Amino acid sequence: MRYIVVDLEATCWEDVRDYDRMEIIEIGAVELPAADSFPTREFSRFVRPTIEPELSPFCQQLTTIRQRDVDRASEFPAVFAEFVEWTGDEPFVLCSWGGYDLTQFRIDCDRHGLSLPKSFERHVNLKKEFARLAGLRKSCGMKGALSHLGLPLEGTHHRGIDDARNIARIAAVILPRLSPLSD
């Protein structure tokens, strides 16, 4: 079974979490050909937001994504089509750190009149599974999980592709311990 580890970055504002306004601005993903394998392929694209095309200063500082990065990017429908094509026809399990990424995919698909592919329905919330397997009372962030495992953060936190790579490192510990996920 293949695993696609995805991390999204979205428009954001200081002290405001408004899901109706948030739009995906980066899709980062890595493919794990098996639960205990290393990433073999990567997908990294910026997305041009349409509701509020100007990134807030807070968003730019948090993500290090610059205005020119999203200005040069395609809008969500085109980038999402590329991502779906990249995932391929073979079955896979979509993995993310928490439920946010899958929710944001649904929101952006609905906003643009797109259907979320059925293949995205097989999803593992790695944040929840990590807390369960580590015996934690409360889930922790990605950086906390890396620290718990004795792994350093690599790359830039809150960048889709870098976070996807880091989450894949955590996934390599978690996925082999989960019940087998069949086709």
Identify the residue ranges that each predicted region occupies:
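Metal-dependent phosphoesterase signature
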Residues: 61-80
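Metal-dependent phosphoesterase core characteristic of DEDDh/y 3'-5' exonuclease domains
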Residues: 2, 20-27, 31-63, 84-183
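N-terminal accessory regions of nucleic-acid-interacting proteins
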Residues: 1-8
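Short acidic, Gly/Ser-rich segments with clustered Asp/Glu that frequently serve as metal-coordination loops
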Residues: 8-17
